[in-house]
Amino acid sequence: MLASLTSRSATSFSIIWALVSAILILSILIWLIITIFFAWNLHLKNNKKRTKYHLEPEQIKHKIIQNKTKLGKMLDFYQQQINTTATELKWLDGQFQQIDETDKKKAHQIAIRLARNQLLQQLSVKLDQKQFSQRANNELQKLKLSNLESFTNQKIKWDQEGMKSAVSRVTINEWTFNHFAGKNRVYWDYFKQVCDVDCSIKPLKDQLEITFSSWSLLKRLQAKNLFNKLIAQSSSVKMSEKLINNALQLVQDNLALQASESGNKLLKEFELSCTNTQLVQLLGFQQFYFGTNLLSLLDLSRSIAVLVRFLNEHCKWELNERLLVETALFNNLQWVNNNDFFLKSHNDLKQLHLSAEQLAIIEQQNRPFYIDAYALLIAGVKQMLMEHDAVEPKQIHFHNAKKVMESFQLFGIDQLALIEYNNCLYGFVTTKLYEIKQLDDLALFKVLFKSFLNKHLKQKFATISLFVNTQTLMI
């Protein structure tokens, strides 16, 4: 029995060992198969890579040529872009230069037409850092004269007593006045330079009654009274330069000195030179006699020529012919329109001797005293309003200024201040002189003027509009 158990046990062990051995062998075979499989796959992959990136010399050469062609095309494209950009830049530079030249020409033309010396200097500095030539200033004066000549056929002559019309009272719709002041602004360009205006406004519902009165005429009347005193003291005396100075001092203390200083200032302003003491004094004296220092050079020369004749005739002064020539032809008046005498005599001015015929020509140029600049304003306003179909001539009334002038004391008018803007003097009663030199000052001026109107017209104004661009003062 023991033997049978032993034999059974041995048989079972053999079977188990055989099974374990078989499983082990099978596992080894499977591992070998898997290893061989992965090794073969890795071999195939490496072989594929080598095959893919392996190029023959011909293939390499072809690739190089192909890439060089592409690179050449890219270089050509970018070079074309560079050339195009350079061309555009060159064109733009040309345009900028052309714009600069155009702007310079326009600015120069504008500068010639501007009346204010300060603006002329500023523009000239911006253009080419140089002062404007005398020719440019002459062109400026020429422009002023052309504006003046268009109204001479309508001017109201001022007689020797100076008592003719100096006030214009106009009743007109406010919109019409503003519209045509802007449309016909050329009319106002000269008015602003020749007229000192005290403008008062009277509201009439939707209309305005505007009264202009001549301040410069009052100054002329004041000067005339002073001259009468001078004539009374010196009518029978032949005067030397010293006696002239003494006579001028009879008119006003230190007037001769003031006249010299004013004359030199005027010479400097117009960039002129003069060594004749008498002439310099007369240049300065014109602001006392004619009531303004805003005369153009031509007006100045004419006024002085008349003044010399006046002194010779009424004061029996022996002012020589040379002085008359220098004053009448002062500042190279070769550009005066329609005057052959001035044109021909300019080149030999220093050697000029006046003939009777030439004196007659000068006499013809110089009307009694000074042309009433305010009459030009009246004529211009009248012409402007008559151009409007809705305005009939009968609506425009001109009144004699005698009562207006009598309301002022000719020797006590210090409280009438002058407000200056672009060669135009606006006057109103105040104790402080206020000068407008730039547009920023206009706001304060409007406040002052509004206060003046409220005080004198006894009516409160809500708004005040000041149209300086059309050379019109309007409420």
Swiss-Prot record:
It is found in: Membrane. The keyword Membrane applies. It comes from the Bacteria. It is a single-pass membrane protein. Keywords: Membrane, Transmembrane, Transmembrane helix. GO terms for cellular component: membrane. The chain crosses the membrane at residues 19-39. NCBIfam families: MPN262 (NF045745). This is Uncharacterized protein MG123 homolog.
